[in-house]
Amino acid sequence: VPYIQYDEHQAMAQWRDLNQSRDWTAIHLLRNGKRVEANARHCPATMALLDRLPQPDIPGAGPNAMFSLLAPNTTIPPHVGVNNSRLVCHLPLIVPEGCWFRVGAELRLWERGQAFLFDDTIEHEAANPTDLLRVVFIFDVWNPALSEVERDAVRRVIGTEGGAEGL
């Protein structure tokens, strides 16, 4: 599924090249707090691991977990997330040499199996300047700085049973 899916009337110029594109796709296991059974059933060990993590259980918004596939010679433009109630974990699985990721002023090359957490409200971008596919497993965890009372407040403010458009 294309990761960026905006209607044409929405003003999202930074996503023009990737909107509805197969250059950046996602295989969602969890999307806006709902299990995507068609995909999750093929990944029982991954789902069991996710169940043991402190995921942001926010109705209609989280948790989220997906395999992010970036086509050869594709760049994800600089962008930011919408709130820091959760952190995002990236676990590189298939990362051809030369693929990179930037958060704020820190640029790093992907290393297979070397996960890292970051606050995606900080500007970030990624690139696959190679001729091979790049695959990273991405999932959310609660920001550890939040108390349970604060998590409940986040659930009430952000959560919707009808389904928000993610965190």
Which residue stretches match the model-derived regions?
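A generic structural motif
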Residues: 96-98, 121-123, 132
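Fe(II)/2-oxoglutarate oxygenase catalytic core
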Residues: 1-66, 70-83, 96-99, 129, ...
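Short, surface-exposed charged micro-motifs
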Residues: 66, 90, 125
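Hydrophobic side chains in beta-strands
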Residues: 29, 69, 93, 103, ...
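A short hydrophobic beta-strand segment most commonly corresponding to one strand
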Residues: 88-92, 117, 132-147
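A short beta-strand-loop-beta hairpin characteristic of the jelly-roll/cupin
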Residues: 93-112
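C-terminal SET catalytic tail plus cysteine-rich post-SET Zn-binding segment of SAM-dependent SET-domain
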Residues: 114, 124-128, 140
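Conserved metal-binding segment of the jelly-roll/cupin
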Residues: 109-123
